Amino acid sequence: MLFETLSVIPEVFDPYLDASIMGRARRAGVFDFLSHDLRDWTHDRHRTVDDAPFGGGQGMLMKPAPVFEALDDLSSRGPRPHVVFFSPCGVPYDQRAAERLAREERVLLVCGRYEG
């Protein structure tokens, strides 16, 4: 099983996945993990991945272009991944969801940035 993340701070995952039970399972080959930097699919010199909401308001929104380009590129590398896009208003992650994901060959977790 391959777990992948698409994030603006991909280096945050390795310390957790190299330690304790997760680290032992990874070293034993139970699963593999790759983290991808969303900024690798940007085209401006500042590698911008977010922008202010067009209708106004507080906070920032993820720009769709880098996300779509990354998903297209990563999906072309091997088996098509099961994509999970985290959202504050999404479906709660529970045991049933964990069991469903465990049956997938490849899972790509798209990690946005949220205020607060």
Give the predicted meaning of each segment:
Residues 63-113:
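S-adenosyl-L-methionine/SAH cofactor-binding core of RNA-modifying enzymes
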Residues 1-78:
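N-terminal nucleotide/polyanion-binding subdomain common to many enzyme families
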